[in-house]
Amino acid sequence: MSEVVYGGGDSLELDALAVYSHPDDAELTCAGTLLKLKSQGRLTGVVDVTRGEMGTRGTPEQRFEEAREAARLLRLDVRVNLDQPDGHVFVTDEARTALVRVIRTYRPKVILTAHWDDPHPDHAATARLAREAARLASMRRYDEAAGQGAAPVPALAHAAYSRLVAPSFIVDVSEFVEEKLRAILAHRSQFYDPSSKEPVTRISDEGFLKQLESRWRYAGSLIDVAAGEAYYVREALNVEDPVELLTRPMNIYS
């Protein structure tokens, strides 16, 4: 059953909603974008599809509190957990209905999510779940008994993490790197701790955050800034002012 982790409110309509599989996924992937949007006065939220209970480190209870603290640091307007089974995320009718209800409640203009070719099965399934729920939320007779009414179809932007995915756009997050790191490290059970007796995982390895920062720097270098977050949009982008778009800073060697 879905649970509000932080914030909320029935009349809240979001500009951007990040939909990711596990607590900490949104922080690792799009925290800079969420922070930038907040600095512009936008309303933002996160959906964690699972509680991360299959993770090697930390308990679901710890991860719940860490997600709440990270939401505070990101200044989110709402954070929701869909309570789907970790390691078993599939595009089921139950999962679609749960996410449709969140979309109809908060009516986001944009959904940020994983890419459907992500090597983690939960991440790939979450990308497909987000796409299907975004469309179904606009269908008046889908889950009609819940009494919510249809919502406009939000645009979807997928994280462009792999070298095989060419970004459609990159967000300059140079000003928000330190805040992003603080939000990531709010999930303290998951990352490097020299005193921890728990098994070492890829993300708890001492060098993981440096590797992550290298990715942000690389994405930033493609648009000639210090740090960036890259996204892929499957649909063609409708550009109102090509001069404004094409005269923004970019790296001609990218």
Task: Place the predicted regions along the sequence by residue.
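Metal-dependent de-N-acetylase/amidase catalytic core
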Residues: 1-17, 90-254
